[in-house]
């Protein structure tokens, strides 16, 4: 069955190449620039491009603000987060901007428009208050009622299923949801936004300022309404009750998206009042949201840290197209590197642990908090005390909030930093929150990746917390472990922990040469390309080193960092954890999740209990976590 007309975008198959359609406008600007020998500031073609950029930034501003959970968590209308399904559905949210820019280009390039001089003379006038008055009048008397009745029509069969249902695909709105729709809906919005402008220009009182001001204010109000964050104080409506019928709120719009039978207006609820579709609980709910009554304490917290400056931009409140895919050095982020560097310095001076993302699992709220420190700072001796203070404050805050389990990420549990979390547990024995390093499950993931027919392995980082546990576990399986370490004292200490009959399977090596015939390398310490050359062809590098080693050898294979896929019933997950694939988290994160789901009452800090590796692994599988 053929799709209904105006229900799909003609450039849908182009993907990101759709932006080539701006080429004609760019060419016009370049041509005028060449002819004038300077920037064509009086060109409508240039203004079309500038307006497109300004509109995109408006939506991005509200999107970023709405996803800064450390600012907005308490005033979110719907507390849940956006999931990957919604991210993908709204991927081409800016189609309406492209459509309206092309319509504008058609008008600017139209011989009839040029001949009647409807647009071009207005460039000489940046501001005309009469035009603003006319535009406001036409917006209230024409645009608002037109949108209201058209919107109500779109909610009736068969128009809803054909054209509008996709826009209501999720109850959690974002500013990008505002732009997500069919061509028919976008054409309707084009008429609604264009009527006041057309009226002002036809009356000869249009101006450049009116175009920018009206369009950007329109986008600003739509973005605000879809932001899912309540920004208008209820005191404003209490002081001036009439205002509640003149301006909508994010709560007002959210009710429409969830219930679908009320609150149809564009910006002015008075039209819902006149049309009998006003949801009367809008302002009471708005008050509750603004006062933070929707707020909920998390049940589980994963305490992460920033890896580096580029990775600091891989967060939900920067670019969703980047944060919803595994981290990579996207060229589009390079111009923002100086800004990110400035924020690094700012956080170093005066920031504290903050909330980055959240999801739900079986009715429980899981959050990721981030210590405002970057990877390199963990190796500065003078920074050690400050980092531990940040982690300690986060643990105490979680304890006050009633968090059940807090899991430490990567460098936050560094042995030299705080003994794998023992520092905090010993200092605060009365803690109710369980502190977990998650390394038991990390070890289990690495060990279960090793083929069952392997007879010997080469282990770097052999005397680390993970290296020790892996070596002791493998020797019990009668697998020979070549432990690379220069410290005989550390090696012997680990060897003595093994049962006497298995100690022979632990072998100390001080160089890479003994591993020339071993095809299973367990990498817990960084390997340079030169060191990797000692591995024979066909070697597989299993990794538990941060950051992961560079895949230098083409005749070898490289495993990823230990990770697990969250259960299928996870909700509100729309963010990729560093280089992990969608739905996959680091094993130490997963270890904390398992600890919480099992309801274990002990802290998991310090040395790894080798006897619990299989216990934790089986518990993870039981709860639906799977190897990534």
Swiss-Prot record:
For this protein, the record's PANTHER family field holds: STEROL DESATURASE
- Chief localization class? endoplasmic reticulum
Keywords linked to the UniProt accession? Endoplasmic reticulum, Lyase, Membrane, NADP, Transmembrane, Transmembrane helix
Name the chain's protein: Very-long-chain aldehyde decarbonylase GL1-2
**Tissue-level expression:** Expressed in germinating seeds, radicals and leaves.
- State the InterPro entries in the record: CER1-like_C, Fatty_acid_hydroxylase, NAD(P)-bd_dom_sf, Sterol_Desaturase_Related
In the UniProt record for this chain, what is stated about the effect of gene disruption?
Early leaf-rolling at the reproductive stage. Reduced wax accumulation (lower total proportions of aldehydes, fatty acids, alkanes and alcohol) in leaf cuticle leading to an increased cuticular permeability (e.g. chlorophyll leaching) and a subsequent altered drought resistance due to rapid water loss.
The cross-references to SUPFAM superfamilies, in alphabetical order and at most eight, read: NAD(P)-binding Rossmann-fold domains
Per the record, membrane topology reads: Multi-pass membrane protein
- Catalytic activity, per the record? a long-chain fatty aldehyde + 2 NADPH + O2 + H(+) = a long-chain alkane + formate + 2 NADP(+) + H2O
Q: What family does this belong to?
A: Belongs to the sterol desaturase family.
What turns on expression?
Induced by drought and abscisic acid (ABA).
Annotated TM spans: 37-57, 131-151, 191-211, 299-319, 331-351
């Amino acid at each position: 069955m053929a799709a209904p007309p105006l229900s799909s975008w003609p450039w849908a198959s182009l993907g990101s190449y759709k932006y080539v359609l701006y080429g004609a406008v760019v060419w016009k600007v370049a041509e005028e620039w060449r002819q004038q020998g300077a920037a064509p500031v009086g060109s409508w073609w240039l203004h079309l491009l500038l307006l497109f950029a300004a509109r995109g930034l408006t939506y991005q501003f509200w999107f970023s603000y709405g996803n800064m959970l450390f600012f907005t968590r308490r005033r979110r209308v719907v507390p849940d987060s956006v999931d990957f399904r919604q991210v993908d559905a709204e991927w081409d949210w800016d189609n309406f901007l492209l459509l309206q820019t092309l319509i504008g280009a058609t008008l600017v390039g139209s011989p009839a428009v040029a001949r009647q001089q409807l647009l071009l003379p207005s460039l000489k006038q940046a501001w005309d208050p009469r035009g603003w008055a006319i535009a406001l009048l036409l917006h209230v008397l024409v645009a608002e009622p037109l949108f209201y009745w058209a919107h109500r029509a779109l909610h009736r069969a068969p128009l809803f299923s054909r054209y509008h249902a996709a826009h209501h695909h999720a109850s959690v709105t974002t500013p990008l949801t505002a732009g997500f729709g069919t061509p028919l809906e976008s054409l309707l919005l084009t008429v609604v936004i264009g009527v006041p402008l057309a009226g002002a220009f036809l009356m000869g009182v249009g101006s450049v300022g009116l175009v920018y001001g009206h369009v950007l204010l329109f986008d600003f109000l739509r973005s605000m309404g879809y932001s899912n964050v309540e920004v208008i104080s209820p005191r404003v409506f209490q002081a001036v009750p009439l205002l509640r019928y003149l301006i909508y709120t994010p709560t007002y719009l959210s009710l429409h998206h969830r219930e679908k039978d009320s609150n149809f207006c564009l910006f002015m609820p008075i039209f819902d009042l006149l049309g009998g579709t006003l949801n009367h609980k809008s302002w009471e709910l708005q008050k509750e949201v603004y006062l933070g009554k929707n707020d909920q304490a998390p049940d589980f917290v994963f305490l992460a840290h920033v890896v580096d400056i580029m990775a600091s931009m891989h967060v939900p409140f920067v670019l969703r197209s980047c944060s919803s895919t595994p981290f990579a050095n996207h060229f589009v982020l390079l111009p923002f590197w100086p800004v990110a560097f400035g924020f690094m310095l700012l956080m170093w001076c005066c920031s504290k642990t903050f909330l980055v993302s959240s999801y739900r699992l079986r009715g429980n709220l899981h959050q990721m908090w981030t210590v405002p420190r970057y990877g390199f700072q963990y190796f500065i001796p003078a920074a050690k005390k400050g980092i531990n203070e940040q982690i300690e404050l986060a643990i105490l805050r979680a304890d006050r909030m009633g968090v059940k389990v807090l899991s430490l990420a990567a460098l936050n549990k560094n042995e030299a930093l705080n003994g794998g979390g023992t520092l905090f547990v010993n200092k605060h024995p009365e803690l109710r929150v369980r502190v977990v390093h998650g390394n038991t499950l990390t070890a289990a993931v690495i060990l279960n990746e090793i083929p069952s027919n392997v007879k010997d392995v080469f282990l770097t980082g052999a005397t680390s917390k993970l290296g020790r546990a892996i070596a002791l576990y493998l020797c019990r399986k009668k697998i020979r472990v070549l432990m690379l370490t220069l410290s005989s004292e550390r090696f012997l200490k680990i060897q003595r922990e093994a049962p006497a009959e298995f100690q022979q399977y632990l072998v100390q090596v001080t160089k890479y040469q003994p591993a020339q015939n071993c095809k299973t390398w367990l990498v817990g310490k960084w390997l340079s390309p030169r060191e990797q050359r000692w591995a024979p062809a066909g070697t597989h590098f299993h990794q538990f080193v941060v950051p992961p080693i560079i895949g230098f050898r083409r005749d070898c294979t490289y495993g990823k960092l230990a990770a697990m896929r969250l259960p299928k019933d996870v909700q509100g997950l729309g963010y990729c954890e560093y280089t992990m694939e969608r739905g996959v988290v680091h094993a130490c994160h997963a270890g904390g999740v398992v600890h919480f789901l099992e309801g274990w009452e002990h802290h998991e800090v310090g040395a790894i209990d080798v006897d619990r590796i299989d216990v934790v692994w089986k518990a993870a599988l039981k709860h639906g976590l799977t190897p990534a």
